UniProtKB/Swiss-Prot annotation:
InterPro entries cross-referenced by the UniProt entry: G_ENGA, GTP-bd, GTPase_Der, KH_dom-like, KH_dom-like_a/b, P-loop_NTPase, Small_GTP-bd
Full protein name: GTPase Der
Binding sites annotated in the UniProt record for GTP 1: 9-16, 56-60, 118-121
One GO process term, biological-process aspect: ribosome biogenesis
Domain EngA-type G: 3-166, 207-380
Subunit text: Associates with the 50S ribosomal subunit.
The keyword Transferase is annotated on this UniProt entry: no
Gene3D superfamilies given in the database record: 3.30.300.20, P-loop containing nucleotide triphosphate hydrolases (3.40.50.300)
Domain KH-like residues, every copy: 381-465
Gene: der
Pfam families (UniProt xref): KH_dom-like, MMR_HSR1
């Protein structure tokens, strides 16, 4: 499961600066979630290939009462949700009473905590951080969040328990190394890696479905309607420490796993109480799912919170089905207004199917599975290099790439770069200089040609590098001898 990192500390110690620097690595700021806690922000970040969710908390003031109230209201909640806590202090201000008060609270929590001294740029870091050792939080990690210095090393140190450790390579003799090298070349020649990829059969894998949305949009009702229709609730299988429930089920001889973030446990225990909503549970469920059902309340329309959640789904590359709930009872006029609003605000996800349902009465719920299967198959379909290159050539013939610096951009070939979501890698000259409009044209062309529905499709561009760039023309010994003889001959003829 993707780890969760919380940033805590006094106001103005650089928590938001560090948050913005980390989330910019994936350009995936999830923004504020109104209705939860005002001063907490959630983001998705990646450092050196290691992904994590990060929480930016509001500053904790220096009074003892203030520490208690603010910690209880927001920072304490963030700490409880987190796997790792980064406790930020200001190296320029030095140790303050508020830092000591926060440290006392953190020492009472059983969490992996890293003491981070920020704003060490332009000062002697070793001298500046000396006082902070008295907090009893172990090693002090000096960083400069505004410039990024020390940030990567800090995150790598913090994520060590969550990074799978590779077994150390055995020490081989020279003969064994040579044998291993040739064996590896043989394996590549035989295409073993390709056979392993082809052996993956998505049909035999259960489809993991996450049902997400704002509070009170009907996630619990929809979950129980799906389970009640199929009557195949086997058992509740705990998924994570954050109590997301993984419920295996079967429909039409196809296996699924419902990831329930709404707190529903068993049929018969459904209440009308307000659904519990945890941002962390939702974000982790999205990361772990194959297909995400985004539930929207038809009576409330699309809020900024829905769009924030939608942005996270797209950045995660997950397949998407939009579910507009509470459709029953609306007048024809209101239904038309809702559809117009969906066209206006969700135009950028035109690849996703939209279903209008009533989870309470069951209308339209059964049709969801057609779109779920369609989205999953689109996301996991294997496409050959020959097919992708042919589609790329057709797109290029229909609409030539624009001129860049007086030269026509040339697309050479395309191949698959990954699945779930589908990634197409295009090689060519000056491809990174293509305007966004042409990149969107290519993406839509591939989507139409491959009939991809329900999943985002990504296109990556790679330059056709000159293999002789930055290489000196070194002569062989034979060429050197010929050159010497030629120069000697030229001298004699002068």
């Amino acid at each position: 499961m993707i780890p969760v990192v919380a940033l805590v500390g006094r106001p103005n110690v650089g928590k938001s600066t560090l948050f913005n620097r980390l989330t910019r690595t994936r350009d995936a700021l999830v923004a504020d979630f109104p209705g939860l806690t005002r001063d907490r922000k959630y983001g998705r970040a990646e450092v050196n290939g290691h992904e994590f969710i990060i929480i930016d908390t509001g500053g904790i003031d220096g009074t003892e009462n203030g520490v208690e109230t603010h910690m209880a209201e927001q920072s304490l909640m963030a700490i409880e949700e987190a796997d790792i806590v980064l406790f930020l202090v200001d190296a320029r201000d030095g140790l303050l009473p508020a830092d000591e008060a926060i440290a006392r609270h953190l020492r009472s929590r059983d969490k992996a905590t890293f003491l981070v001294a920020n704003k060490t740029d332009g000062i002697d870091a070793e001298v500046a951080v000396g006082d902070f050792y008295s907090l009893g939080m172990g090693e002090v990690h000096p960083i400069a969040a505004s410039h990024g210095r020390g940030v990567t090393q800090l995150i790598e140190d913090a994520l060590v328990p969550f990074i799978p450790q590779e077994a150390p390579a055995p020490v081989l003799s020279e003969e064994e190394e040579n044998a291993a090298y040739w064996a590896e070349l043989e394996a590549e020649a035989d295409g073993e890696a390709q056979e392993e990829e082809e052996a993956f059969d998505p049909i035999n894998q259960p489809i993991k479905i996450a049902i997400v949305g704002r509070p009170n949009v009907g996630k619990s009702t929809l979950t129980n309607r799906i389970l009640g229709e199929d009557r195949v609730v086997v058992y509740d299988m705990p998924g994570t420490t954050r109590d997301s429930i993984y419920i295996p089920m079967e429909r039409d001889e196809r296996e699924y796993v419902l990831i329930d973030t709404a707190g529903v446990r068993k049929r018969g225990k459904v209440t009308d109480t307000v659904e519990k909503f945890s941002v962390i549970k939702t974000l982790q469920a999205i990361e772990d799912a194959n297909v995400v059902l985004l539930v929207i309340d038809a009576r409330q329309g699309i809020s900024d919170q829905d769009l924030s959640l939608l942005g996270f789904i797209l950045n995660s590359g997950r397949s998407l089905v939009v579910v507009v709930n509470k459709w029953d009872g609306l007048s024809l006029e209101v239904k038309e207004q809702v559809k117009d609003m969906l066209d206006l605000r969700l135009g950028f996800v035109d690849f996703a199917r939209i279903h209008f349902i009533s989870a309470l009465h069951g209308s339209g719920v059964g049709n969801l599975f057609e779109s779920i299967q369609e989205a999953y198959e689109s996301a996991t379909r294997r496409v050959s290099t020959a097919m992708l290159t042919r589609i790329m050539t057709m797109a290029q013939d229909d609409h030539q790439p624009p001129m860049v610096r007086g030269r026509r951009v040339k697309l050479k070939y395309a191949h698959a770069g990954g699945y779930n979501p589908p990634i197409v890698v295009i090689h060519g000259n000056q491809v990174k200089d293509l305007p966004d409009s042409y990149k969107r044209y290519l993406m839509n062309y591939f989507r139409r040609s491959l009939n991809v529905m329900g999943t985002p499709i990504r296109i990556q561009f790679k330059e056709g590098d000159n293999p002789f760039a930055n290489k000196r023309n070194t002569l062989t010994p034979n060429q050197m001898r010929k050159r010497k003889r030629l120069l000697s001959h030229l001298k004699k003829t002068k």
